[in-house]
């Protein structure tokens, strides 16, 4: 019987529910689905049907009705199924959902249908449930309902009835927890199955608390509630615990009926709480937030984020079950019973119908509260101790063993628990003794306790709405959150509230008290205080830390010492280390700059650490602000501000002298960016003498040298020392030119350096030279950054001679040496000391050719320049040549030219330097003659008083043109100034097409340093830039295609030679090294002007608009075309320096010098020497030589081109090497010459087809590829076009060669004693070279791959020979059988058979020893014993042949003339074995096999061994083995990794067959793996697998 469905108005039945019990299926719905809005399809009901949980108190019949309804909804029999199917399905499902404790009993009964099953279950309940007057409802739901109605409070009977029905449905879910059922189809993993039974002792819990519970109620229905309570307790008391299961079930149901009420919407409340309906509420589904005090409070229970719904009650029930009934297995009992504890209407009916968890929770609380009030409740030991109850009260909220609700454990943010208890607990909570709030009453209840059911444990405040109570609890949680450092996992609502309420108080500025939501905002705010404090510190010159430490310490206290990061430079603080790292980049730049910075600091010995105290930091920087502008002195707090500020000075003149000691400001215009990158570190090395900061310690040391030499300029008649520094790193576009002020007669020293490091490298010898008066010293140095690597080689100075020349290293260091020699002039008058130092970006380490201009007292000067050919040529530097100047120790000028660019040949200084006639002047034009001539013609820079100053006209590369206190960029040709280098660049293009007229009054010194790709360079500069590609190494007289090659070479031989070669005459053009001791020696005679680089034909042609290639003379209208063209020459082969004693200078057309000195404009063909008056004619002429190598100086002893008077250059390549006179490209195999490389390629194919690559004959031939063969133009040492340098094999294209070269990777290069590798003509190989020799023809190879290909030819021949030999053998065998059959049988049968095993046994040993023979001495010894072992049989060490010698001797009368037909065919093999017969000798050398020679007899009397190294013959294998030892140290035999190498054959004789069968029995053995093959071809193919 179903109980009457008394539904109050506040609990309307859902329209979607088919009946009252369908609401129970809400447990199966998804947590986020709201009942009434869920899906209605069959699958939805199917899931509900499958996941229905059996609730014991609902009753079996009700459960059956529920299942049928769900199944109908699911199966829809009107359309899909029949009734019988439904019945079976229901039965199956019913059997699945019955309690586990009943399943065995029910299954034993085997019910046939659902009715029988229900009957069994009802009988079971009646069987184990004792009869009682007051609890007749125990046997059936109707009785239970009736009893509850009778005992229900009168104030809300109807409502309570409805609530009871709903609670029954809740109980039906709770009493049979899902955990008890094994729902395999349930996707939501339920908790382990549990037993819902309660211990028997639980029944007495309410027996003792019954009266106390009634007394504790403070509303009208107290008596009624007490009566219902008494009834329930009576039921428990009357029942005897005869059956444990029955007692548990009975007790459980009664306790649940007295517990909290299950709201009518309890079922679907699970669907709306945001947690899984089973996985999170698997233990107590009915109590999961669907429990409410009244139906009206349904909506509030659906809220999410409410913490007291499931968790607290579930934990309470769990603890109750644990503490009270240790044997309880009811997972449902530990389900959240939050809602039940918050519902005020707790009539007896409701108590009965309330879910188990809620009842247990309420009972537990009642028990405690009764005892807590010390009255009413008879709390005896049968229940649980008072202490345990109190403990549970205090700790149930913090229960974390997973039994309670997820919300309680994780989502509840309150620090103290709050909980909705029963009616009794309401009263107790109002008295502030209970921390658990009570559910509100219904409207019919007059007591105010019902309106304020939720009491805060912290402050005692009560709330009627749970949401308000939760928010109130959040406030306490937030307040205590940071105090205890605890983190709470709370619901979304709590998170949002906390985020909004916590942020404002978290980050507070300790200085001003301002608060921030984020630490980043606080950090930004603190910057204001930090900067203000910095200013204050600066004003007070305090030496303390920038930021006050208290804030930092306080923050450390808050966040921990490891959680706060402070910038040691500006004292800004950060919460994260990553933020600090990003911030520090402002101070120190990127990591790379930091690394360089610290490296430089270590070199200097002072490591800059921003972390130390500020006083040290300020001491380092002179108590100034960290970043100071070196131009205007303005200081900045941050390097970025300084960088921005420095941009202002790039438009002006950054070279203002700021101090007397050091007036240098290193802010180069072109490299400003690079400079600025390191400006934040510029104060790392603060020189005490000035305001300059040096980025590197090396710069500091060099700069200190400047100060040690500055005394020369300061206080000795020099008012200024202007050092213009600008790195040359990009394209050496230095357009710096010093125009000495005409109004300045005072002695000045202008040091113009394109490299900031240049000024740091002022000569170290300057202090030595103290002269009476120095009119002017112009030091022009175009140095690159890499130039710092070069070393200074200035020789010891001789002050008394004062004619010291500085050896310029390839950097600004040559400045030091230049100035050392340049300012040493000591005489009555010193017209000028011109020190021109052109340093390129990768300056070669060749020694600078310093031309010394010596003048006697009469004004005579001699410019000494060594010739390439050790010939000193003395040419009058001016109309009045100085005679005897070499003996005069007073020199008018010391012209020290240091050209350390990649092409320093072009230094021919002393143009006007030798023309001093008391009032004469040596005007030394800079590297660009044309530029200087223009300046000279316009009298812009050189017309100063008495011609006492000479102008250093540097190259107009677009670099800053410095005019003291003038505009930054000045045109060197016309004097026009520009504010931007780009404007000057555009302007210079106008001059690039103009050619100034030469002047006869000055001897020209062509000093050019030009980047070939610089589009801003003039025509003459372009020519020189191309010539730079032919860098010449003075040390080894070698050409290099690029400055990088030369620099690399010089790194090796940089310091091997002396820098003071005085009279050897081997100094390279512009690189002659004259130590300072040289100047003043008697050897210096007349002025010698070196003209190695005097071949700029177009330099002085003002009408020529064509850019001429200095290498081949081709003209180009566009500079970029010339640049591209020069790339071809940059890869041309060069002469190996070791083979020749003199450096071969690529001297361009002598027309340059002819123009300089005769005014003629000639364009000379560098190839044949023919000259032309215009470059266009030369252009046409050069097409003939376009593919030729310009200079093949293999036999050239003289690379110097004589100065005036000069004749057209002869083709010295043809003179030195007549073989090259006809054509430059020559076949290395046959010597045939070709005009173009393509013809040679076609010709080489013929050689490859004929296999005529004779490498040993190609040693003296040189391939000079042309334009079309740029791939081959690596070096002149590469003799073949695409020839492998290891094995000599040639290839058509470089790709094939590249693939081939990988085979030789990591192979050593060493020659044998009698072997010469033809691919390397000038340089010995550097490792061991394996020796491979063809056994068939005796040809030698240095790599197995070549031998492999070579052997293929022999294999083809052998196959043909074997075929022919097979036929001949057959005929021979027939003939032998006819004439001497007995002899043949005897030879091949008995004796041969007897000797063969020993031979074969010895042969593997010999072959096994062959690899050792190749590698070491055991060769011969291993072979010797084997041979000797076989000798008794064969009278020789030949295993295969001489073993048969006794037989041959014995049977010679009969079989002497017998020859095997295959012997001839195999004869090449024997010879093929011979080359490695060093190791393989026993197999074939000197052995006349039975098959050998068709027309020859078997030669066994005199065996011999031929040595292929020395062609010596031995008759004994022992002697031969000993002889091989002599070659072991010279030749390394590579063991058996090529075709035919060390491959012997094993010949097996047959007694039953003749020679033909012997051929069939012959096997060839691989010496690598020992595998046998029938023919040599198979062996060769097999060995190819070993060689790869």
Curated annotation (Swiss-Prot):
**Which one of the record's GO molecular function terms can you name?**
zinc ion binding
Residue segments, region 3 X 7 AA repeat of P-E-V-E-A-A-E:
1397-1417
Among PROSITE patterns, the record links this protein to:
SCAN_BOX, ZINC_FINGER_C2H2_1, ZINC_FINGER_C2H2_2
Q: Where is the composition biased (Acidic residues)?
A: 129-142, 1395-1415, 1449-1466, 1475-1495
The reply to whether Glycoprotein figures as a keyword in the UniProt entry is no
**Pfam families per the UniProt record, alphabetical:** SCAN (PF02023), zf-C2H2 (PF00096), zf-C2H2_6 (PF13912)
Of the GO CC terms on this record, one is: cytoplasm
This protein's source sits in the domain of life called Eukaryota
Mind listing the UniProt keywords for this protein, alphabetically? Answer: Apoptosis, Cytoplasm, Metal-binding, Nucleus, Repeat, Zinc, Zinc-finger
- Give the residue ranges for region: 4 X 5 AA repeat of P-X-G-E-A: 1418-1443
UniProt region (Disordered), positions on chain:
128-230, 266-306, 319-349, 588-610, 838-930, 1056-1104, 1393-1495
In which ranges do the sequence repeats occur? 1397-1403, 1404-1410, 1411-1417, 1418-1422, 1425-1429, 1432-1436, 1439-1443
The UniProt function text for this chain reads: Induces apoptosis in cooperation with SIAH1A. Acts as a mediator between p53/TP53 and BAX in a neuronal death pathway that is activated by DNA damage. Acts synergistically with TRAF2 and inhibits TNF induced apoptosis through activation of NF-kappa-B.
This one is known as Paternally-expressed gene 3 protein
What organism does this protein naturally occur in?
Pan paniscus
GN (gene name):
PEG3
């Amino acid at each position: 019987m179903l109980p009457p469905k008394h539904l109050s108005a506040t609990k309307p039945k859902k329209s979607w529910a088919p009946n009252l019990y369908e609401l129970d299926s809400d447990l199966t719905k998804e947590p986020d689905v709201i009942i009434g809005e869920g899906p209605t399809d069959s699958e939805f009901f199917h899931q509900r049907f499958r996941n229905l949980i059996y609730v014991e108190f609902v009753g079996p019949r009700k459960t059956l009705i529920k299942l049928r309804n769900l199944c109908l909804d699911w199966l829809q029999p009107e359309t899909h199924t029949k009734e019988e199917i439904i019945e079976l399905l229901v039965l199956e499902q019913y059997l699945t959902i019955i309690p586990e404790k009943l399943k065995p009993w029910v299954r034993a009964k085997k019910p046939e249908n659902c009715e029988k099953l229900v009957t069994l279950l009802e009988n079971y309940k009646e069987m184990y449930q004792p009869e009682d007057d007051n609890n007749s409802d125990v046997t059936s739901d109707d009785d239970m309902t009736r009893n509850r109605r009778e005992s229900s409070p009168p104030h809300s009977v109807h409502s309570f009835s409805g609530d009871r029905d709903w609670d029954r449905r809740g109980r039906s879910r709770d009493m049979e927890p899902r955990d008890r059922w094994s729902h395999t189809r349930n996707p939501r993993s339920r908790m382990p199955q549990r037993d819902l039974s309660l211990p028997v002792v639980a029944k007495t819990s309410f027996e003792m608390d019954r009266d106390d519970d009634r007394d504790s109620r403070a509303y009208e229905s107290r008596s009624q509630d007490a009566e219902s309570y008494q009834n329930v307790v009576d039921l428990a008391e009357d029942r005897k615990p005869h059956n444990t299961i029955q007692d548990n079930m009975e007790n459980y149901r009664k306790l649940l009926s007295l517990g909290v009420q299950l709201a009518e919407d309890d079922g679907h409340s699970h669907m709306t709480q945001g947690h899984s309906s089973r996985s999170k509420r698997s233990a107590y589904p009915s109590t999961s937030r669907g429990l409410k005090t009244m139906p009206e409070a349904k909506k509030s229970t659906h809220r999410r984020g409410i913490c007291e719904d499931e968790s607290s009650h579930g934990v309470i029930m769990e603890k109750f079950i644990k503490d009270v009934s240790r044997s309880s297995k009811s997972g449902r009992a530990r389900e959240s019973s939050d809602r039940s504890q918050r519902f005020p209407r707790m009539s007896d009916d409701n108590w009965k119908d309330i879910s188990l968890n809620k009842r247990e929770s309420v009972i537990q609380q009642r028990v405690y509260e009764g005892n807590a009030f010390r009255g009413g409740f008879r709390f005896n030991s049968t229940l649980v101790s008072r202490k345990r109850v109190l403990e549970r009260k205090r700790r149930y909220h913090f229960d974390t063993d997973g039994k309670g609700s997820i919300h309680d454990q994780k989502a509840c943010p309150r620090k103290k628990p709050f909980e909705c208890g029963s009616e009794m607990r309401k009263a107790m909570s109002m008295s502030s003794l209970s921390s658990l709030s009570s559910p509100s009453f219904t409207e019919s209840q007059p007591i105010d306790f019902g309106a304020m059911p939720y009491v805060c444990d912290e402050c005692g405040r009560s709330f009627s709405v749970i949401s308000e109570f939760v928010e109130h609890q959040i406030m306490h949680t937030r307040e205590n959150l940071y105090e205890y450092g605890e983190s709470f996992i709370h619901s979304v609502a709590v998170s949002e509230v906390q985020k909004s309420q916590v942020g404002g108080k978290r980050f507070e500025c300790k200085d001003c008290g301002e608060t921030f939501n984020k630490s980043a905002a606080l950090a930004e705010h603190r910057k204001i205080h930090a900067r203000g404090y910095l200013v204050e510190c600066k004003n007070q010159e305090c030496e303390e830390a920038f930021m006050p430490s208290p804030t930092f310490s306080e923050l450390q206290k808050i966040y921990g010492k490891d959680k706060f990061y402070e910038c040691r430079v500006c004292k800004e603080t950060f919460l994260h280390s990553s933020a600090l790292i990003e911030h520090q980049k402002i101070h120190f730049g990127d990591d790379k700059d930091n690394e360089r910075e610290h490296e430089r600091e270590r070199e200097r010995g002072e490591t800059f650490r921003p972390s130390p105290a500020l006083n040290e930091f300020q001491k380092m920087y002179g108590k100034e602000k960290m970043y100071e502008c070196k131009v205007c002195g303005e200081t900045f707090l941050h390097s970025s501000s300084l960088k921005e500020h420095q941009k202002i000075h790039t438009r002006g003149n950054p070279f203002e002298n700021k101090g007397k000691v050091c007036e240098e400001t290193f802010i180069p215009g072109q490299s400003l960016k690079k400079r600025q990158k390191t400006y934040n570190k510029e104060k790392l090395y603060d020189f005490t003498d000035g305001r300059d900061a040096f980025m590197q310690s090396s710069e500091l040391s060099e700069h200190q040298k400047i100060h040690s030499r500055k005394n020369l300029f300061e206080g000795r008649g020099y008012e200024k020392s202007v050092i213009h520094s600008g790195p040359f790193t990009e394209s050496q576009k230095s357009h710096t030119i010093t125009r000495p002020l005409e109004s300045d007669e005072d002695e000045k020293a202008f040091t113009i350096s394109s490299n900031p490091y240049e000024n740091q490298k002022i000569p170290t010898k300057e202090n030595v030279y103290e002269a009476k008066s120095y009119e002017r010293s112009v030091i022009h140095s175009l140095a690159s950054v890499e130039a710092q690597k070069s070393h200074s080689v200035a020789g010891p100075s001789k002050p008394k001679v004062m004619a010291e020349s500085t050896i310029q290293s390839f950097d600004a260091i040559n400045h030091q040496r230049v100035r050392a020699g340049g300012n040493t002039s000591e005489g009555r008058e010193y017209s000028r000391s011109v020190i021109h130092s052109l340093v390129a970006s990768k300056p070669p380490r060749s020694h600078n050719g310093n031309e010394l201009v010596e003048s006697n007292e009469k004004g005579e000067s001699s410019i000494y320049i060594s010739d390439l050919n050790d010939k000193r040529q003395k040419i009058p530097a001016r109309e009045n040549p100085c005679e005897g100047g070499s003996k005069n120790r007073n020199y008018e000028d010391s012209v020290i030219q240091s050209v350390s660019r990649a092409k320093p040949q072009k230094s021919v200084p002393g143009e006007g330097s030798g023309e001093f006639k008391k009032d004469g002047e040596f005007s030394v034009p800079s590297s660009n003659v044309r530029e200087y001539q223009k300046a000279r013609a316009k009298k812009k820079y050189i017309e100063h008083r008495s011609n006492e100053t000479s102008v250093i006209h540097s190259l107009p590369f677009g670099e800053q043109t410095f005019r003291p206190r003038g505009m930054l960029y000045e045109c060197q040709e016309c004097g026009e100034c520009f504010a931007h280098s780009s404007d000057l660049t555009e302007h210079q293009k106008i001059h690039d097409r103009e050619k100034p007229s030469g002047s006869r009054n000055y001897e020209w010194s062509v000093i050019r340093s030009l980047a070939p790709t610089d589009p801003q360079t003039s025509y003459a500069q372009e020519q020189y830039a191309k010539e730079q590609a032919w860098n010449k190494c003075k040390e080894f007289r070698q050409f290099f295609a690029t400055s990088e090659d030369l620099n690399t070479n010089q790194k090796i031989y940089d310091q091997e030679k002396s820098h003071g070669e005085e009279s050897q005459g081997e100094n390279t053009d512009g690189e002659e090294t004259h130590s300072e001791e040289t100047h003043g020696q008697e050897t210096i005679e007349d002025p010698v002007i070196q003209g190695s680089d005097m071949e700029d034909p177009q330099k002085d042609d003002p009408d020529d608009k064509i850019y001429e290639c200095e290498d081949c003379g081709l003209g180009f209208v566009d500079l970029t075309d010339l640049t591209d063209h020069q790339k071809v020459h940059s890869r041309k082969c060069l002469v190996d320096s070791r083979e020749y004693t003199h450096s071969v200078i690529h001297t361009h057309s002598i027309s340059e010098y002819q123009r300089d000195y005769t005014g003629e404009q000639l364009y000379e063909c560098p190839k044949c020497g023919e000259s032309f008056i215009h470059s266009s004619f030369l252009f046409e002429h050069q097409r003939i030589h376009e593919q030729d190598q310009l200079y093949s100086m293999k036999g050239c002893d003289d690379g110097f081109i004589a100065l005036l008077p000069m004749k057209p250059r002869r083709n010295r390549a043809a003179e030195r090497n007549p073989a090259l006179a006809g054509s430059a490209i020559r076949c290395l195999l046959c010597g045939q010459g070709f005009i173009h490389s393509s013809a040679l390629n076609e010709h080489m194919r013929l050689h490859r087809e004929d296999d005529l690559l004779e490498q040993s004959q190609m040693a003296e031939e040189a391939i000079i590829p042309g334009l079309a063969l740029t791939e081959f133009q690596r070096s002149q040492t590469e003799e073949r076009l695409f020839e492998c340098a290891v094995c000599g094999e040639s290839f058509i294209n470089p790709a094939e060669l590249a693939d081939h070269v990988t085979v030789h990777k990591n192979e050593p290069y060493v020659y044998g004693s009698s072997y010469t590798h033809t691919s390397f003509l000038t340089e010995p190989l550097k490792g061991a070279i394996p020796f491979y020799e063809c056994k068939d023809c005796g040809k030698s190879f240095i790599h197995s791959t070549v031998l492999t290909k070579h052997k293929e030819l022999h294999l083809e021949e052998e196959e043909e020979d074997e075929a022919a030999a097979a036929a001949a053998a057959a005929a021979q065998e027939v003939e032998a059988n006819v004439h001497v059959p007995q002899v043949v049988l005897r030879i091949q049968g008995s004796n041969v058979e007897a000797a063969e095993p020993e031979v074969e046994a010895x042969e593997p040993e010999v072959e096994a020893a062959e690899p050792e023979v190749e590698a070491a001495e055991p060769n011969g010894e291993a072979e010797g014993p084997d041979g000797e072992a076989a000798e008794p049989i064969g009278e020789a060490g030949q295993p295969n042949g001489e073993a048969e010698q006794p037989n041959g001797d014995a049977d010679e009368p009969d079989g002497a003339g017998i020859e095997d037909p295959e012997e001839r065919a195999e004869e090449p093999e024997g010879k093929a074995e011979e080359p490695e017969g060093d190791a393989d000798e026993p197999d074939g050398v000197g052995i006349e096999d039975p098959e050998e020679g068709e027309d020859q007899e078997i030669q066994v009397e005199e065996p011999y061994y031929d040595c292929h190294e020395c062609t010596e013959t031995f008759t004994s294998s022992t002697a031969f083995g000993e002889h091989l030892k002599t070659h072991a140290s010279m030749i390394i035999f590579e063991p058996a990794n090529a075709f035919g190498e060390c491959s012997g054959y094993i010949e097996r004789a047959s007694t039953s067959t003749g020679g033909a069968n012997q051929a069939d029995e012959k096997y060839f053995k691989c010496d690598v793996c020992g595998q046998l093959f029938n023919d040599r071809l198979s062996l060769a193919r097999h060995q190819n697998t070993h060689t790869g």
